[in-house]
């Protein structure tokens, strides 16, 4: 065996170079572990970073918003407010519904939060109304998170009440049991019930009241324990015909006797099978339907949950009659899969481009195969670690691997290029591999750890943004570490076995032409570098100018939070005048649906009218517009939204608010628009004074569009002003008045019908077909203490007033949300600043506090920490480089390349019309790690030349620049081509990936051009500074 000199021992690579079989098997093990890990990894749109969120819904039919707030919401809020780990509590109290949304700290497990919520509900039970039909129901779901799947159930042969009954008992319950499903809601409100519509004139003529009827019905329909008989030899269970099951049985119920003749319920009321709530409706396109929305639990994997639903659906639909049709109207996983597939394609494209650039520079197939093996091996091996860390295959981890393509090849290129140089000088391949790998080992370690140091601050980003990019940063760091291992083990071993002088000297026409081209480029660079070194102060002024320019660009570039994605689904809110009835709103909704369905980009539409846990008032409707796949429509979602709003503007009396659904949901409320700003006060009066003024001013700002608020205080109220003295004289209490009104107009649930499969309600109300509006109040009768019947009008006056349609709280205090969008020619940063400036001009009183919510609040938080994040990345890199070089000066030389990357990235973003958002900022941070590689490769060789060959600093850096020009250019182009597919992406989810690619490509181009000249000059200036400093210290010591 050839004896090698000490300088050629190969360092940490020697063992692997000398043991090719062991090295090969080790790499095979990494490959197999990565393949197994890839198959085991779940797929999702983004890392699971949801806040633990629980929604508590309480329904109290007939209750006003004020009653819901004071009697239901407030007692629950007081108990919930004592829970530990609660981050934010918001509530919405509307007519008959209270919805409380509890958002917990990211560190609190959802199951623990669930236990605390259940305990709080139990503690509040005694404080809630005694006639509450059902206790509060909680769901582990974020109401602002769009459904993962929407299904429409229709039938041409069956009434909707029967359809809902079957869907609820046979389909919804089974889907709710699937792991990951948080809530299954049935919109349409056609739950079966027996409806008793009292004829007010008939019961008045007979001297009866609605309370008499209610008492008779509740007493006639019971379902309670009756006991059993235990004899000497037999035990007998007692049962009775105490349950009435059908409308016909209730129709025959005797409610009173008059002159010894029975009065049956059918004599004074219309009794029929109907819906429990007649003021709810849902439509699929233009057809009335039961719409099933499936929402996931926070943290659940959306793909696996949707797959489980899809697998179960055929079995569930088989249990339904043939006339019932179940249609999947939307499935968010379709776009998620398409987005992930596009990102995977861009990853493969990046690998192909990187390998192509390697061949272009090396012009040798064996030399190209080596990094061609190292790149996929490093990426595939990363999957094994991702499984161990419980990560997923999502857009961000795939973006990390795509960017890593340009990173991981750098190490292999540097090793191959250095070993090839020694082989071309006449060294044997084995000796060249040992010598080249040993010489470059420290550079590889420096490159690796300085790059990972850049990613460290990402791990310490706070709140949801930090959680979001944790997987991105760690995935990229793991790929870089595996790349370093491969480059110090497999790559030199393959070089020793596959490269030779003959293979490197073997040239074809392309090789010779490209060699001449590179020689000319290097020669031109050498001439330019010599001139630059002769004019250092001019070059230094250019470097300082880039620093100043980067600061100016940072200040003036439009800033955003997260790119608006086109996921093919639009959420909409339809708003009508505040006094609109259910019938009126349903008619308007159908008019709007006709307009929307005419748009060529729209595939289907679901809409919902009525008050329940998702819709706050009768004058609003919820819509979900499902667009055709991206390749089947001409326009992206923002243009479709603009076109739809223009078309719906022609429908009189309605306002339509639309926003595209996003993979990242930070809000906890379903909002009309993408962004929210809240005003909070201690009383509703303060809000009623200032909210309209602020909204009016904000609507005039060009930086905002679709400005509206959820403050609706013009809801019509018929105020029953009871003369308490007169009522007391007649023996009539306020409870009697409330009961009479509730019986007549509250769709009161007065009894329950129990069956083997479900429970159904008996609904009591007055038949108001012949006495619409306020005239119906004249039919109300009450019973006095002597048994007489007293008209309500004799003891009360009816006053028409205005009152809020809903009352919203944030952390137990009244709040109003102002919603807004941002026009195309402005950024979120512009909008936020405009709102803050307008707020200052109003001089709001001190008892009103304002705050941005949802993604706008996250934007402010992320923007505030961005500068510190970049500073932390620079400091971390300085510390690592200082430790590696045992120098305070050389790390500064290396870091001097950073402003050029910032200028290039910011200029590219501005030229492309992109905002400086979180994704683009991540790209800039990655650029900090990339561009310093050029300086590291130059400085490493310059220091070695000074130390080992005795060169002067100028000659050393000049030779280092020429010697390392080709690998510097190669690695930069590899990183650039790795980011190029992201910059040019046009498929599903491209909006998320493009800012990262644009920033990195722009930064790499500018930094490549400038750092080749500025780094040598700064190196020499700092070298002179170091010599001057040493001489000063030496002089002081001599004088001392």
From Swiss-Prot:
Per the UniProt record, the source organism is Escherichia coli O7:K1 (strain IAI39 / ExPEC)
Where in the cell does this protein reside? Answer: Cell inner membrane
Task: Name any one GO molecular function.
Answer: xenobiotic transmembrane transporter activity
UniProt xrefs under InterPro entries = AcrB_DN_DC_subdom (IPR027463), Acrflvin-R (IPR001036), Multidrug-R_MdtB (IPR022831)
Record-given protein name: Multidrug resistance protein MdtB
Which protein family is named in the record? Belongs to the resistance-nodulation-cell division (RND) (TC 2.A.6) family. MdtB subfamily.
According to the UniProt entry, the coiled-coil residues are: none
Q: GO cellular component terms?
A: plasma membrane
Q: How does it assemble?
A: Part of a tripartite efflux system composed of MdtA, MdtB and MdtC. MdtB forms a heteromultimer with MdtC.
Q: Which NCBIfam families match?
A: PRK10503.1, RND_permease_2
- Which gene produces this protein? mdtB
Identify the domain of life: Bacteria
Q: Which UniProt keywords apply?
A: Cell inner membrane, Cell membrane, Membrane, Transmembrane, Transmembrane helix, Transport
Q: How does it sit in the membrane?
A: Multi-pass membrane protein
Triggers of expression? The mdtABC operon is transcriptionally activated by BaeR.
**Keyword Transmembrane on entry:** yes
């Amino acid at each position: 065996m050839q004896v090698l000199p000490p300088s050629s021992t190969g360092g940490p690579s020697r063992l692997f170079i000398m043991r090719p079989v062991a090295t090969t098997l080790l790499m095979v093990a990494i490959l197999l572990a990565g393949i197994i890990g890839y198959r085991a990894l779940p797929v999702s749109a983004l890392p699971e970073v949801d806040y633990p969120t629980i929604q508590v819904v309480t329904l109290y039919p007939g209750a006003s918003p004020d009653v819901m707030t004071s009697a239901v919401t407030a007692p629950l809020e007081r108990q919930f407010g004592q829970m530990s780990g609660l981050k934010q509590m918001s509530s919405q109290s509307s007519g008959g519904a209270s919805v409380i949304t509890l958002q917990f700290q990211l560190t609190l497990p959802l199951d623990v939060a669930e236990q605390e919520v259940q305990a709080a509900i139990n503690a509040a039970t005694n404080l809630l109304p005694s006639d509450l039909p059902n206790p509060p129901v909680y769901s582990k779901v974020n109401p602002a998170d769009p459904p993962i799947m929407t299904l429409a159930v229709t039938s041409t042969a069956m009434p909707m009440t029967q359809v809902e009954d079957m869907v609820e008992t046979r389909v919804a319950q089974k889907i709710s049991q699937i792991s990951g499903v948080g809530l299954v809601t049935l919109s349409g409100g056609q739950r079966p019930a027996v409806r008793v519509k009292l004829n007010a004139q008939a019961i008045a003529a007979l001297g009866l009241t609605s309370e008499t009827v209610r008492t008779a019905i509740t007493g006639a329909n019971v379902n309670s324990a009756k006991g059993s008989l235990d004899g000497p030899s037999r035990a007998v269970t007692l049962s009775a015909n105490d349950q009435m099951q059908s409308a016909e049985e209730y129709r025959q119920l005797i409610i009173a006797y008059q002159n010894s003749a029975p009065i049956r319920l059918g004599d004074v009321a219309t009794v029929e099978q109907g819906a429990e709530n007649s003021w709810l409706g849902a439509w699929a396109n233009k057809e009335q339907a039961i719409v099933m929305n499936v929402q996931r639990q926070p943290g659940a994997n959306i793909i696996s949950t949707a797959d489980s639903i899809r697998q179960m659906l055929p079995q569930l639909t088989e249990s339904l009659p043939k006339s019932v049709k179940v249609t999947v109207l939307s499935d968010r996983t379709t776009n998620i899969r398409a987005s992930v597939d596009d990102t995977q394609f861009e990853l493969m494209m990046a690998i192909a481009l990187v390998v192509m650039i390697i061949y272009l520079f090396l012009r040798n197939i064996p030399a190209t195969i080596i990094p061609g093996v190292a790149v996929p091996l490093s990426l595939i091996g990363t999957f094994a670690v991702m499984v161990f860390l419980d990560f997923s295959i999502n857009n961000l981890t795939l973006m990390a691997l795509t960017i890593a393509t340009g990173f991981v090849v750098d190490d292999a290129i540097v090793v191959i290029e250095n070993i090839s140089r020694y082989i071309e000088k006449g060294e044997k391949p084995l000796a060249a591999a040992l010598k080249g790998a040993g010489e470059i080992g420290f550079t590889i370690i420096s490159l690796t750890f300085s790059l990972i140091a850049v990613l460290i601050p990402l791990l310490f980003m706070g709140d949801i943004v930090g959680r979001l990019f944790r997987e991105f940063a760690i995935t990229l760091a793991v790929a870089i570490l595996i790349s370093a291992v491969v480059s110090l083990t497999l790559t030199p071993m393959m070089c020793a076995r596959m490269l030779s002088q003959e293979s490197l000297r073997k040239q074809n026409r392309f090789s010779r032409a490209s060699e001449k081209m590179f020689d000319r480029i290097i020669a031109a660079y050498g001439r330019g570098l010599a001139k630059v070194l002769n004019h250092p102060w001019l070059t230094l002024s250019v470097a300082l100018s880039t620093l100043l320019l980067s600061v100016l660009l940072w200040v003036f570039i439009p800033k955003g939070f997260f790119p608006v994605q086109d996921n093919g689904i639009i959420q909409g809110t339809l708003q009508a005048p505040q006094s609109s009835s259910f019938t009126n709103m349903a008619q308007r909704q159908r008019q709007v649906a006709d307009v929307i369905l005419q748009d060529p980009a729209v595939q289907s539409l679901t809409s919902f009218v009525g008050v329940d846990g998702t819709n706050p008032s009768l004058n609003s409707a919820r819509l979900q517009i499902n667009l055709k796949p991206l390749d089947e429509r001409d326009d992206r979602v923002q243009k479709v939204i603009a076109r739809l709003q223009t078309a719906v503007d022609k429908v009189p009396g309605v306002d339509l608010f639309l926003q595209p659904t996003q993979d990242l949901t930070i809000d906890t409320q379903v909002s009309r628009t993408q962004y929210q700003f809240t005003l909070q006060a201690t009383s509703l009066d303060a809000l009623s004074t200032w909210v309209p003024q602020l909204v009016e001013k904000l609507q005039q700002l060009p930086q905002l569009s679709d400005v509206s608020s959820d403050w609706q205080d013009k809801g019509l109220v018929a105020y029953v002003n009871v003369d308490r003295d007169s009522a007391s004289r007649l023996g009539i209490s306020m409870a009697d008045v409330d009961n009479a009104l509730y019986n007549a107009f509250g769709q009161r649930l007065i009894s329950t019908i129990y069956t083997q499969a479900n429970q159904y309600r008996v609904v009591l109300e007055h038949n108001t077909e012949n006495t619409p509006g306020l005239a119906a109040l004249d039919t109300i009768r009450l019973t006095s203490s002597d048994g007489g019947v007293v008209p309500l009008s004799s003891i009360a006056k009816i006053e028409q007033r205005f009152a809020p349609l809903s009352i919203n709280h944030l952390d137990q205090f009244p709040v109003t949300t102002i919603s807004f969008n941002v026009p195309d020619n402005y950024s979120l940063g512009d909008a936020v600043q405009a709102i803050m400036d307008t707020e200052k001009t109003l001089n709001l009183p001190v008892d009103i506090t304002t705050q941005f919510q949802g993604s706008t609040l996250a934007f402010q938080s992320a923007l505030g920490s961005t500068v510190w994040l970049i500073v932390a990345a620079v400091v971390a890199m300085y510390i690592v480089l200082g430790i590696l070089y045992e120098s305070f000066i050389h790390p500064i030389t290396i870091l001097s390349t950073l402003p050029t990357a910032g200028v290039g990235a910011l200029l590219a973003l501005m030229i492309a019309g992109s905002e400086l958002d979180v994704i683009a900022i991540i790209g800039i941070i990655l650029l900090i790690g990339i561009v310093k590689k050029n300086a590291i490769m130059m400085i490493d060789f310059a220091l070695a030349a000074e130390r080992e060959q005795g060169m002067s600093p100028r000659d050393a850096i000049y030779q280092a620049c020429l010697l390392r020009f080709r690998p510097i250019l190669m690695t930069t182009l590899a990183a650039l081509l790795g980011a190029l597919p992201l910059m040019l992406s046009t498929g599903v989810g491209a909006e998320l990936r493009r800012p990262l690619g644009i920033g990195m490509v722009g930064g790499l181009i500018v930094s490549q051009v400038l750092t080749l000249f500025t780094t040598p000059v700064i190196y020499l200036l700092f070298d002179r500074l170091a010599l001057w400093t040493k001489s000063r210290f030496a002089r002081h010591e001599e004088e001392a």
